[in-house]
Amino acid sequence: MSKKITEQDIIDSVASACQFISFYHPEDFVKGMVEAYENEKSDAAKNAIGQILINSKMCAMGHRPLCQDTGSVNIFVKVGLKANLDITKNLEDLLNEGVAKGYTDPDNTLRYSVVADPAGKRTNTKNNTPAVIHVSVDNSDKLDITVAAKGGGSENKSKFTVLNPSDSIYDWVMSNVKDMGAGWCPPGILGIGIGGNPEKAMLLAKESLMGHVDIHELKARGAQTPLEELRLKLYEDINKLGIGAQGLGGLTTVLDVKIL
């Protein structure tokens, strides 16, 4: 039988994850930024990327937030049917307790960006809850929890559309990226969800961002599917737009394009 998972295990794990992602960039993102820095020809863009990398190192060393916007929390949970869960509380409540604990940590208090009664008084909840939680079930003996913090700059640039069969996904994406400006703090990763109904497509887009930065591996081996061809074409052509780091021009607007 698998190890017993308690309520406190869940709370502490989520709290720790919220703190961890507040001051550590993923390694694949840092590698992508270093490569972008090394390849950049524009002095302004190179300086902007350099500042992001310096900030990343300082935050990692000092355990301080990477940005003043510490995001709204997105949690993806896979509940194994064989998992040994020793809980009596609602799982969603436990996850939110973990978020509250992580964001109110006195050693590194994070910004609270969530309000109650959003159509009315808009009162800050003072602990960044509730999180946006997605739960699925599999046949494992594990409880898999992925925690992400999504900043408002990029989240507010999210787009959705219903295309006609004759419409071009490529054209729609390119048109929207051109108009987004730099409010989403490029260089970043573009996540695209295709198919299903409206909420499914948006969820796929968010889930795609959980993948590793691997566009250069894809370029090296070559596209093997239409989606991979679309990824490469969008990656190349978006970076030709000249938006660049923090909107200052240059060669790198996106580090990767993800599609599910």
Predicted features, each with a name:
Residues 1-260:
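Non-transmembrane, aqueous-exposed alpha-helical and coiled segments at domain scale
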